[in-house]
Amino acid sequence: MSLNFLDFEQPIAELEAKIDSLTAVSRQDEKLDINIDEEVHRLREKSVELTRKIFADLGAWQIAQLARHPQRPYTLDYVRLAFDEFDELAGDRAYADDKAIVGGIARLDGRPVMIIGHQKGRETKEKIRRNFGMPAPEGYRKALRLMEMAERFNMPIVTFIDTPGAYPGVGAEERGQSEAIARNLREMSRLTVPVICTVIGEGGSGGALAIGVGDKVNMLQYSTYSVISPEGCASILWKSADKAPLAAEAMGITAPRLKELKLIDTVIPEPLGGAHRKPEVIAASLKAQLLADLADLDVLSKEDLLNRRYQRLMNYGYA
């Protein structure tokens, strides 16, 4: 896979371009007198060291860019890599099937679970079909329908959060966007089965929270979770989206900061350079965390599960 490099990764991109050029020359002419393999190996080591140096000191704005990386794994990528026998379920049984939310039954290490997650697109047509990962009310109602089904069949629920936010269009508002989100918040707090939520990319405001009330909340290392985008915050406070880096730092949107504030449980480490560099590696780490979370929750009775979730919600914020 050809990698897309972000602005702050340009020194790495230049090194990788040199490596690609040398590799191409080596393939074209195997009779060269110089030892290209040694030079390529040296440059690869230099690239890894440079990547390690850059990623050791990332700011919140750079992490926000990584969370939006176009090659970052999405919900269906994790379904393919970490689960078996996925059977997608569609529709809210009231209006339509929102493609920005995907869901269905799968097996996690042989155990049936209900998966629900935001889904963005990669190509232009797919992005439009998925509405860039911004759900309408019917998407959240579909999610709730699947959660209620999981509760009936005593299946744990696993959600993947990756959205800029709920769709703010006129049609979505007319069909009850705020009501759909609020209902999900209420009903998720009452579910009698384990609910594990993981932010895999962008965790945008109420659009993320609508599938984010759980017994365990995890974040990938380079994901973000916030009430508004850094650009939106900057536009309100400083009347300029150019102040987004400053807003990102002030908002505390990164996984380590949210862990420090006790808003999430676990930060799942990503491969060097981000999840898009090695999707199989991050999928294995995510699967291991989900299995560990399920093991912790399986020992709780339904009453204890609900009490624990209630206390979790009551502990948010300051009194």
UniProtKB/Swiss-Prot annotation:
The record's principal subcellular location, in a coarse class, is: cytoplasm
Location within or outside the cell: Cytoplasm
- The domain of life for this entry's organism is Bacteria
Q: Which UniProt keywords apply?
A: ATP-binding, Cytoplasm, Fatty acid biosynthesis, Fatty acid metabolism, Lipid biosynthesis, Lipid metabolism, Nucleotide-binding, Transferase
CoA carboxyltransferase C-terminal domain sequence ranges? 35-296
Q: What class of enzyme is it?
A: transferase
For this entry, the protein name equals: Acetyl-coenzyme A carboxylase carboxyl transferase subunit alpha
**GO-annotated molecular function:** acetyl-CoA carboxylase activity; ATP binding; carboxyl- or carbamoyltransferase activity
- Coiled-coil stretches are none
Q: Which reaction does it catalyse?
A: N(6)-carboxybiotinyl-L-lysyl-[protein] + acetyl-CoA = N(6)-biotinyl-L-lysyl-[protein] + malonyl-CoA
Give the similarity note. Answer: Belongs to the AccA family.
Instruction: Name the job this protein performs.
Output: Component of the acetyl coenzyme A carboxylase (ACC) complex. First, biotin carboxylase catalyzes the carboxylation of biotin on its carrier protein (BCCP) and then the CO(2) group is transferred by the carboxyltransferase to acetyl-CoA to form malonyl-CoA.
- Mind telling me which GO cellular component terms the entry cites? acetyl-CoA carboxylase complex
What's the Enzyme Commission number for this chain?
2.1.3.15
Q: Which NCBIfam families match?
A: accA, AccA_sub, PRK05724.1
Subunit composition? Answer: Acetyl-CoA carboxylase is a heterohexamer composed of biotin carboxyl carrier protein (AccB), biotin carboxylase (AccC) and two subunits each of ACCase subunit alpha (AccA) and ACCase subunit beta (AccD).
Which pathway does it serve? Answer: Lipid metabolism; malonyl-CoA biosynthesis; malonyl-CoA from acetyl-CoA: step 1/1
Q: List the PANTHER family hit by this protein, alphabetically.
A: ACETYL-COENZYME A CARBOXYLASE CARBOXYL TRANSFERASE SUBUNIT ALPHA, ACETYL-COENZYME A CARBOXYLASE CARBOXYL TRANSFERASE SUBUNIT ALPHA, CHLOROPLASTIC
The alphabetized list of GO BP terms reads: fatty acid biosynthetic process; malonyl-CoA biosynthetic process
